[in-house]
UniProtKB/Swiss-Prot annotation:
Lineage of the species this protein comes from: Eukaryota, Metazoa, Chordata, Craniata, Vertebrata
Region (Disordered) location: 707-730, 800-840
Name of this protein: Ras-specific guanine nucleotide-releasing factor 1
Molecular function terms from GO: glutamate receptor binding; GTPase activator activity; guanyl-nucleotide exchange factor activity; receptor tyrosine kinase binding; small GTPase binding
Gene Ontology CC terms: apical dendrite; apicolateral plasma membrane; basolateral plasma membrane; cytosol; glutamatergic synapse; growth cone; neuronal cell body; plasma membrane
Start and end residues of each PH domain: 22-129, 456-582
Modified-residue entries (Phosphoserine), positions: 71, 575, 611, 739, 760, 781, 854
Domain Ras-GEF as annotated: residue spans: 1009-1241
Annotated source species: Rattus norvegicus (Rat)
Name of the gene: Rasgrf1
Effect of residue 575 to A: Abolishes degradation by the proteasome
SMART domains: PH, RasGEF, RasGEFN, RhoGEF
Ranges for domain DH: 240-426
Effect of residue 71 to A: Abolishes degradation by the proteasome
GO biological process: cellular response to antibiotic; cellular response to insulin stimulus; negative regulation of MAPK cascade; neuron projection development; positive regulation of fibroblast proliferation; positive regulation of MAPK cascade; positive regulation of Rac protein signal transduction; positive regulation of Ras protein signal transduction
InterPro entries, per the entry: DBL_dom_sf, DH_dom, GDS_CDC24_CS, PH-like_dom_sf, PH_domain, Ras-like_GEF, Ras-like_Gua-exchang_fac_N, Ras_G-nucl-exch_fac_CS
Length: 1244
């Protein structure tokens, strides 16, 4: 048995009496113990951390004691009272004291008064020695601090006393000196012979008034001079100039901080890592990545310190000498600029090392980096010189011509502009690498194929992936279902070589789907994948889906079905995918095109053409290759750009998109159309003379000289009639050297002549009504290659040889579109993707160029692989076509398209080559028109003359007797797209929404919920943003004097932004009560947070900027009533849309969010102004700055990505009417006056 703890009973009794007399809290309480569940009334007294209780207030000895140190006191709810209880009519208030010891039960107490209960709880909560000790320590600290202050004050007082004493001595000395001077003056005056007469008192008064008036007039004149100067243009320019300098100081401080992070967080740690035992990176690679970075940091630290010193001497600001220090160091920047592309390439290569990639992610995770990547920090110096140029432009705009710094600033600007042009080119050329690395970093699993610096980013967006199990069950209702959209929504990224399909996970991270990395060389696009044999079904899906058939080299084939949100978006995706597939296949198939005994191939045609890689007076190239492995154009004349557009040997998707976006800057649509028409009518002019010489030359034909085109009645196609077909036969045993790649390289769309012979029996899913946005041109990806119905023994031997040589015979890329006449033969049953066996029973139709019967089926990749085998692809072609349809017309087409040498004269072969060139020219013209019509339809909606000319041209094409059926079908689809009556969706939806509000009474703000306002504001913002045509983004029209005429929709967006901002401020100031204003602020902040969830970042900035304006921000009494949660949320929203670091937080959020989305337009306008100010549209030689056009096109591409995806929000006219009503909206001056009226300024 444990012994009881002994206490000094007498001392406890004395403390109890002391508590009874001097306790901090005394009174009757009811307590309940564990031994006795009944409530007992006792008299309690609290002394420090001791709680005594007595039988009554007159007891001389306490009944018990509780030590409260470390206990917790809190109120507890009243227990339910029984109806039979005697005390049921009396209200009690309970609280408990919990002790730190778990074994000790809590003390339960109750009172009859709620206020008394609260006071007991508060008193017991403060009854702790620890609290007293803490307060005592704080008081001691204050006491020591006061002692130090007193000592300091004593010292100061002593010094002041000493100064006073010294002052008194000095005063006494001065008094004595004055007294002496007075005596001397009196002596001099007494010696004067004539004493002045006393002046009249009136004269003295007059002189005094005159003196007062002279002083008043002088002060008034001086005040007027000061006021006139303050209002003068010179003073206004100086104020703006000072503001520019202060902004420059802030930007320079931020830039120095960025360089400091680059050097200290990346460069120096990587140098140490390179010296480790197992280095993840070499010293050479570190030097290549960070060339001159440390030197640039030191240079700008010196520049920043000099700038701070100039600011310290304000208002005298001399800046020219600072730039004189910077200019001689520009060679350091030049080395950094020239190395920039190589730096990012080395970085991409190093990131393939897992150890380096892991280490780099650790560095980037540091708080200083703020989730920015190394590529971002390496790009910051590229933007600094253009920023200096903009600053100098503003300084010169506010610097008088006679200013002492004018000439120096002009000289600095000219030198910086020379370097800026080079920098813009380098940024343009490395933008693709940085974009690829940014996307690769967003994918959680990583994606090594994006580390290939030759990949070119084309487009991205959200598509819905439909599982194959639902094939044939897709309808409009199912496509719009939330479950399918949530489960099937995919983030798709199209590159020049691959299609990446991802899902969006938590934290905005991307995850690759199964088979999410698709190589485009293995792809075949089916425009309408569903088996829609009845019109009703086709109308249900609205032609929004398309199918990609993938046939990997080392895995079974599979199919991906994707659904776009609109027909326009589908047209853009399918056009770009087809273009990329053609580009990559044409690059691989070049080795066989026009292959003859003279071994003249298309690569030789390109290599022999110096105009494709050598600078000339009318063209200059960058170091970067485009998607067709041809040098990108940096500067070029308009004529050379049009030549590149119509060059039949290649056409890169990035050049085509940039050209169609920007051609209005340097030419007009009629010139482009005329060039396409001329190429169609005279296709031989689309190939340079040197390439023509190589093409038409052979061992038997040397008649063509350099620069001479072959003379033939077929060289000009208009009104030409087909020549007599040369009928000839050749034995299948004679294996001519043929090119299986029938078409010339058209760059975008190779001929699909082979697809004309593909029947419909074996593949029922390929037939669909012709979509106006469907694929309309011809494609090398649609080749059907097979042997004849009957084979000779030698053919069988060749087939056996092919099989024994390990040739793959997978399903080939087959025809995706059939003529309308074939649709009646469609089988209703679904079949799996076709196999070689499923094609063997096909019967050729129309032009059976190739038949599937022998089982020989080769994809384009197989054909390239076969070039390295003993059996050439051309031999396989001869075997495959040996027993084809024997009609003379078909045999002549085979012979022409195969460009056979054996058995035909050189003149006949030249005619065959011209035939292929005409086919390629036709496809090029139709391909460019298809991209133009589907992606840039507004060009034709706003220009009736252009539309008329295109329609006339297409009608002429369709009536050409030499036109092939697939070409005629392509032209018909373009015509259908161009002539169909479609309402301009962008403007009509906004007009309809505003029309719905007519006659609707404006309801007050309180009648609308935050959710309703956020949704309707998002819908309104999106429609206004969507209505901006992309041509307004060129030329900085929004900053010109005639901005309302040049960019009406951008200005409409700006006015809408300002209207909503003024509406919010007016709504807050409309309330007279402080609490009402605070609740209005809280509600608008809630609206902003909902808009953030809806990805409407424009509205977030509208609301935060409105609340941040001085008329609202100065309302201190109102802000005291706003809750802490609202203030915290407001700060979070402000940080999201902050302009710091060129809107770095907003850019990162946009990069990780899925459309629909409404970005802040001003961010993109700043980027475009940055590009426009830094570089001109034309060089001094009059060449178009195509690198600049490429960068602007990339910005427009991102804007259009957000414009294309719409919100599924139902309009609410009442809420919309409230948002657009301008009746009660105040302007800036009225808002500030209302703010002063509500809370006047405090007197100073």
């Amino acid at each position: 048995m444990q012994k009881a703890i002994r206490l000094n009973d007498g001392h406890v009794v004395s403390l109890g009496l002391l508590a009874q007399r001097d306790g901090t809290r005394k009174g009757y309480l009811s307590k309940r113990s564990s031994d006795n569940p009944k409530w007992q009334t006792k008299w309690f007294a609290l002394l420090q951390n001791l709680l005594f209780y007595f039988e009554s207030d007159s007891s001389s000895r306490p009944s018990g004691l509780y030590l409260l140190e470390g206990s917790i006191c809190k109120r507890m709810p009243s227990p339910k009272r029984g109806t039979s209880s005697k005390e049921s009519d009396k209200q009690h208030h309970y609280f408990t004291v919990n002790f730190s010891n778990d074994s000790q039960k809590s003390l339960e107490l109750r009172t009859d008064d709620s206020k008394d209960c609260d006071e007991w709880v508060a008193a017991i909560a403060r009854a702790s020695y620890k609290i007293l000790a803490t307060e005592h320590e704080a008081l001691m600290q204050k006491y020591l601090h006061l002692l130090q202050v007193v000592e300091t004050e004593k010292t100061v007082a002593k010094q002041l006393r000493q100064q006073l004493e010294d002052g008194e001595v000095e005063i006494e000395r001065l008094k004595a000196e004055i007294a002496n001077l007075i005596k001397d003056n009196e002596r001099i005056q007494s010696n004067q012979l004539v004493a002045p007469e006393d002046e009249d008192s009136d004269i003295k008064k007059i002189k005094k008034v005159q003196s007062f008036l002279r002083g008043w007039l002088c002060r008034r004149k001086w005040k007027n001079i000061i006021q006139d100067y303050i209002r003068s243009p010179h003073a206004d320019s100086m104020r703006k100039r000072n503001q520019v300098v202060f902004s420059m100081l802030e930007a320079e401080a931020e830039y120095v901080q960025q360089l400091h992070i680059l050097v200290n967080n990346f460069l120096r740690p990587l140098r140490m890592a390179a010296s480790s035992k197992k280095p993840p990176i070499t010293h050479d690679d570190v030097s290549s990545i960070f060339l001159n970075s440390e030197t640039i940091m030191f240079l700008h630290q010196i520049f920043y310190q000099g700038l701070k010193a100039r600011i310290a001497s304000w208002p005298t600001l001399v800046l020219a000498d600072l730039f004189d220090i910077l200019l001689p160091m520009l060679n350091i920047y030049q080395e950094f600029v020239r190395n920039h592309q190589y730096s990012l390439q080395i970085l991409a290569h190093c990131k393939q090392n897992r150890d380096f990639d892991k280490l780099l992610k650790q560095y980037e995770a540091k708080p200083d980096c703020e989730e920015r990547t190394l590529e971002t920090f390496l790009t910051y110096p590229m933007f600094q010189i253009p920023r200096y140029i903009l600053t100098l432009h503003e300084l010169l705009a506010h610097t008088p011509h006679e200013h002492v710094e004018r000439n120096s600033l002009d000289y600095a600007k000219s030198k910086l502009e020379e370097l800026s042009r080079v920098m813009h080119d380098e940024v343009s050329e490395t933008e693709n690498i940085r974009k690829n690395l940014a996307i690769e970093r967003m994918i959680t699993e990583g994606c090594e194929i994006l580390l290939d610096t030759s990949q070119t980013f084309v487009r991205q967006g959200s598509l819905i992936q439909v599982p194959m199990s639902e094939k044939g069950k897709i309808n409009k209702g199912r496509l719009g279902s939330l479950s399918l959209k949530k489960e099937g929504e995919r983030q798709c990224f199209l590159f020049s070589k691959h299609l990446i399909i991802c899902t969006r996970g938590s934290g905005s991270k991307l995850h690759l789907t199964k088979n999410g990395v698709i190589s485009l060389i293995d792809c075949t696009l089916l425009d309408d994948p569903e088996n829609m044999d009845d019109d009703g079904k086709g109308q249900e899906v609205d032609h929004l889906d398309f199918k990609i058939w993938v046939e990997p080299k080392d895995s079974p084939p599979f199919t991906v079905i994707l659904v776009a949100s609109s027909r326009q978006e589908k047209a853009a995706w399918t056009s770009d995918i087809i273009q990329c597939v053609d580009n990559i296949r044409c690059n691989g198939l070049m080795m066989n095109a026009f292959e003859e005994n003279s071994k003249v191939t298309v690569p030789q045609m390109i290599k022999s053409d110096a105009s494709l890689y050598c600078d000339d007076v009318d063209i200059r190239f960058s170091k970067t290759m485009n998607s067709c492995k041809v040098l990108q154009i940096r500067y070029a004349s308009v004529e050379r750009l049009l030549e590149r557009l119509t060059d039949l040997r290649f056409l890169s998707i990035d050049f085509l998109n940039t050209f169609l976006h920007s051609y209005r800057v340097f030419t007009d649509a009629v010139v482009v159309l005329d060039k396409l028409i001329s190429i169609y009518k005279k296709p031989i002019t689309a190939i340079p003379a040197r390439s023509l010489e190589l093409l038409f030359s052979s061992s038997h034909n040397t008649k063509l000289l350099y620069g001479d085109a072959p003379k033939s009645p077929r060289a000009s196609r208009k009104f030409s009639s087909p020549p007599p077909l040369a009928i000839g036969t050749s034995s299948p045993v004679r294996r001519r050297k043929l090119s299986l790649n029938i078409p010339i390289i058209t760059g975008g769309k190779a001929l699909e002549l082979a697809s004309l012979g593909c029947p419909s029996d074996g593949y029922t899913n390929i037939h669909s009504p012709i979509s106006p946005f469907g694929k309309t041109t011809l494609d090398t990806s649609k080749l059907c290659v097979a042997s004849s119905l009957t084979r000779t023994p030698e053919e069988i031997d060749m087939t056996t040889l092919e099989e024994s040589s390990g040739f793959r015979k997978p399903t080939s890329d087959i025809l995706k579109e059939e003529s309308d006449d074939d649709q009646s033969d469609v089988d209703d049953t679904e079949v799996s993707p076709p196999t070689p066996k499923s094609f063997r029973n096909r019967i050729t139709q129309e032009f059976p160029l190739f038949n599937y019967n022998s089982g020989i089926m080769m994809t384009c990749r197989d054909l390239m692989d076969s070039n390295r085998s003993p059996l050439s692809a051309t031999s396989a072609f001869a075997i495959a076509t040996a027993g084809a349809n024997e009609s003379p017309a078909n045999k002549e087409i085979y012979r022409r398209m195969s460009l056979a040498n054996t058995g035909y004269s050189s003149d006949q072969r030249n005619i065959d080559k011209e035939f292929v060139i005409r086919r390629a020219a036709t496809n090029r013209v139709l391909n460019v028109l298809r991209h133009w019509v589907t992606k840039h339809s507004q060009d034709f909606e706003t220009d009736d003359l252009l539309k008329y000319k295109v329609i006339c041209f297409l009608e002429e094409v369709m009536h050409d007797p030499d036109l092939l059926p697939q070409e005629r079908k392509a032209a018909a689809n373009i015509m259908r797209t161009l002539t169909q009556e479609e309402i301009t969706e962008n403007h009509s939806m906004l007009d309809e929404l505003l029309l719905m509000t007519e006659g609707v009474k404006t309801e007050p703000f309180e009648n609308h919920s935050a959710m309703e306002i956020a949704e309707q504001l998002t819908l309104l913002d999106h429609l206004v943003f969507k209505s901006i045509p992309y041509e307004e983004f060129f030329g900085q029209g929004w900053m010109k004097a005639d901005k309302n005429e040049r960019t009406p929709y951008i200005m409409k967006t700006t006015r809408h932004f300002n209207h909503i901002s003024n509406l919010i401020a007016s709504e807050i100031l409309r309330n007279e009560e402080v609490s009402a204003r605070a609740s209005t602020i809280e509600k608008w902040v809630a609206v902003a947070d909902i808009c953030r969830c809806l990805h409407n970042y424009n509205a977030v900035l509208e609301i935060t900027s409105s609340i941040n304006r001085s008329a609202i921000f100065r309302l201190k009494k109102t802000w005291l009533k706003v809750s802490k949660q609202t203030k915290s949320l407001f700060d979070k929203l402000q940080k999201l849309v902050s302009s710091d670091g060129r809107f770095k937080n907003l850019r990162e959020t946009l990069r990780n969010c899925d459309p629909p989305c409404v970005p802040y337009l001003g961010m993109y306008l700043t980027d475009l102004a940055f590009l426009e100010e830094g570089t001109p549209n034309y060089t001094e030689d009059g060449l178009v700055n195509f690198s600049k056009m490429r960068m602007i096109s990339h910005i427009i591409r991102e804007i259009r990505q957000f414009q294309q995806t719409t919100y599924k929000i139902e309009p609410q006219p009442k809420v919309t009417q409230y948002l657009v009503d301008e009746t009660f909206v105040l302007d800036d001056e009225s808002l500030y006056e209302a703010s002063l009226r509500i809370e006047p300024k405090l007197p100073t």
